[in-house]
């Protein structure tokens, strides 16, 4: 499984996820529930403090009705 490693990539992707989540009117807890993650995990991903694997990224995208090309 590929993992995003550089801080700038993590931050950029996290900001994109946060923006999409807010546009969808979802809380971090709601998004987490939809994709099988805890709220704190969503928070760490959005803030760029956690590397996100492709499987997790795909689950987040699906939970918001998106595909991975949003990245």
Residue ranges of model-derived segments:
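Alpha-helical transmission elements in cytosolic ATPase-linked domains
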Residues: 2-3, 47, 59
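Recognition helix of helix-turn-helix/homeodomain-like DNA-binding domains
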Residues: 36-51
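A detector for short, charged/polar N-terminal pre-domain segments
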Residues: 1-12
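DNA major-groove recognition helix of helix-turn-helix/homeodomain DNA-binding modules
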Residues: 55-71
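Short amphipathic helical patch at the helix-1/turn junction of helix-turn-helix
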Residues: 11, 22-23, 51
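Short basic helix-loop element that most often maps to the first helix and adjoining turn
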Residues: 15-34, 59
């Amino acid at each position: 499984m590929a993992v995003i490693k550089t801080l700038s990539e993590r931050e950029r992707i996290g900001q994109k996820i946060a923006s999409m989540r807010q546009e969808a009117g979802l809380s971090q807890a709601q998004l987490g529930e939809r994709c099988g993650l805890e709220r704190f995990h969503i928070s760490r991903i959005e803030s760029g403090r956690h590397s996100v694997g492709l499987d997790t990224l795909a689950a987040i995208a699906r939970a918001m009705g998106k595909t991975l090309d949003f990245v």
